Each structure stands twice: as C-alpha cells, then as structure tokens.
Amino acid sequence: MKPLTPRQQQVFDLIKSKIEDTGMPPTRAEIARELGFRSANAAEEHLKALARKQAIEIIPGASRGIRILLEDAANDDQGLPLIGQVAAGEPILAQEHVESHYQVDPAMFKPKADFLLRVNGESMKDIGIMDGDLLAVHKTQDVRDGQVVVARVDDDVTVKRLERKGSTVLLHAENEEFSPIQVDLTSQHLTIEGLAVGIIRNTDWM
C-alpha cells in the first residue's frame, strides 16, 4: 500500500473501525458526517484516492461497496498470502480470500511478488504452469501484450497470455485443447489483477 496523507489515513482508519465494530463499511454520507466533510461527494474523492493507492477497492453500485485490501502484504512477517477461491464481485486481495501465508521472499521474483494464487486446471501446462502450482503474482495493471496475466473477466478469475486487439482482448491458453477467451470490452468487464512472475511447484511444500 502506498503512503497515505493524514486525511486519507483518517478515512482509512474510519473504514477499518466501522468494519470491526459493525461488520460493514460506512456509506459516503456517514464518512462525510463523521469527518466533517461538506458532502458525500468529498468523501467519494477521498475513497477514489485510497483506491488509487491500493488501500481499498471500490465496488461499483453499492452504497457500502468498500473493501479493505491487504496492507503491505508482501512485507508482512507472515509471508506471501495465498489467495484461494475468489468470490464474485469482490477484490482479489480482500482479507477473506487469504487461505494461508507462505514464507517466501517476494524479492526472489522480478518484479517482486505481492501474492500467490493456486493454479486450477491445465490450460497453461505447455509453459510449465501446472494444476495445483502456486503462481507468484505482482499486483499491477501495467502489462504488455504477450505477458501472462491474472485477469478477471466479469466475475471469473483466470491465468492467460494477454493479447489486445482494439476493443477486444484475447486471453490465450498455453494448451492446444483450450480455445482463447475473447473479451468484448464494449459489453464485458475486464480487470487485470496482476502479472505472473514465477511458479512454486506444488510438490515444494509437501
């Protein structure tokens, strides 16, 4: 998570406090009222700034659609978080998705890894990404064509090789038995969750 301004830290701390006390994040109006903002729009601007700094993720269309992301996950003494099943509509680094932590140095990957994702299936086996492997992922949306990415298409998370063609994105498997996933950006929602930076073989932890 990038450093926050004092005001942004106030908003972030309020969100955490509300979730801990009530189980729900605050609405924009509640943030504005408790922190003395002139309007809910002012609260929204601070939320957008927090989202840009990867402190939170905003879920569109919900008055309480705020999720706190892992704080400095890759620097945590617990190790790299292993992300399990990702619930529809929720950010991949939401706390509830963390199955466990592995004592792996993030700096052994270039760029450094922020989290691990368990590979499900054999669509990328031809480049050595096997079912059950732990995929090391650098959280970024700055990716190039030809790179292997973790992508969310609507509510499904997948690992594929990226190719952009205008308003269409092709997500290619590395297994001839799998056809490319074609994403029409005019009607479908695509989010790049990160860049694949390495593999930990599933037998390494047995």
Curated annotation (Swiss-Prot):
Role description:
Represses a number of genes involved in the response to DNA damage (SOS response), including recA and lexA. In the presence of single-stranded DNA, RecA interacts with LexA causing an autocatalytic cleavage which disrupts the DNA-binding part of LexA, leading to derepression of the SOS regulon and eventually DNA repair.
Keywords in alphabetical order, please. Autocatalytic cleavage, DNA damage, DNA repair, DNA replication, DNA-binding, Hydrolase, Repressor, SOS response, Transcription, Transcription regulation
Q: Give the site residues for Cleavage.
A: A88, G89
Q: What name has this protein been given in UniProt?
A: LexA repressor
Q: How does it assemble?
A: Homodimer.
Q: Which GO terms describe its biological process?
A: DNA repair; DNA replication; negative regulation of DNA-templated transcription; proteolysis; SOS response
For this protein, the DNA-binding region equals 28-48
